[in-house]
């Protein structure tokens, strides 16, 4: 599976042993942005108290980031109203119409709103240093993972997938905007090449250069999940079993 690193922890909690074996995204690439129309005088995260905050879906990683940022200024998740807005046109419309005062979301939504002046960045985990500040350590994101049984039975296949992904990681680090446009299928460009290129360039630094999963990454991911799941928070899990380099 190509998916979020934290799924390996969630699956172990449910009794299914998955292991991540090569990293794609070194950070979650989530951005918290403020609505300049409804919050023109925004100064700090504490100003979000009592406000409506859009997330891709309640309980998702975009919601987790909001919880972490609120906690840093002494606020509880219940101090804001969390509203699910998706990651597409609905999210853009919610921001532009003033239905929400802030939004925790991903590209291309963030870049679209930035370009039209409908969003002001408050926290940007596309920047590795900012991501580590928010989550208290490295927060691995997109990766390839598989059931431990598959890895044990198919070591050559797993190694081949790893080699291919590391080559892709290295190619992306060296690639320019024109290279990306040539390589990416038209359907992924969302009908707007300029937005896609802007989003890619903003996120490029958060893509893994070598596929290596950071040793402290599982702890950061566990803490993030524990913030939205009380049962998982008290579970005894083997975090060394959720990844391998």
PLM region spans:
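Pocket-lining segment of extracytoplasmic ligand-binding domains
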Residues: 90-93, 97-186
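Hinge/cleft segment of the Venus flytrap/periplasmic-binding protein
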Residues: 234-245
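Secondary-structure end/capping motifs
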Residues: 151-233
């Amino acid at each position: 599976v190509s998916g979020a690193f934290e799924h390996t922890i969630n699956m172990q909690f449910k009794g299914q042993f998955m292991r991540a074996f090569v990293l794609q995204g070194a950070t979650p690439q989530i951005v918290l942005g403020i609505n300049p129309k409804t919050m023109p005088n925004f100064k700090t995260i504490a100003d979000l108290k009592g406000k409506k905050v859009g997330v891709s879906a309640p309980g998702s990683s975009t919601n987790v980031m909001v919880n972490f940022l609120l906690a840093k200024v002494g606020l509880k998740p219940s101090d804001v109203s969390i509203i699910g807005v998706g990651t597409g046109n609905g999210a853009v419309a919610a921001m532009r119409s003033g239905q929400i005062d802030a939004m925790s979301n991903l590209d291309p939504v963030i870049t679209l709103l930035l370009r039209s002046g409908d969003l002001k960045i408050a926290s940007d985990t596309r920047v590795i240093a900012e991501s580590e500040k928010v989550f208290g350590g490295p927060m691995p994101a997109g990766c390839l993972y598989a059931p431990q049984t598959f890895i044990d039975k198919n070591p050559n296949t797993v190694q081949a997938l790893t080699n291919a992904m590391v080559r892709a990681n290295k190619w992306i680090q060296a690639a320019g905007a024109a290279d990306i446009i040539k390589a990416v299928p038209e359907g992924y460009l969302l009908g707007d090449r300029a937005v896609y290129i802007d989003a890619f360039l903003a996120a490029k630094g958060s893509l893994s250069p070598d596929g290596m999963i950071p040793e402290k990454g599982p702890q950061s991911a566990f803490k993030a999940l524990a913030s939205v799941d009380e049962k998982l928070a008290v579970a005894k899990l083997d975090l060394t079993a959720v990844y391998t380099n």
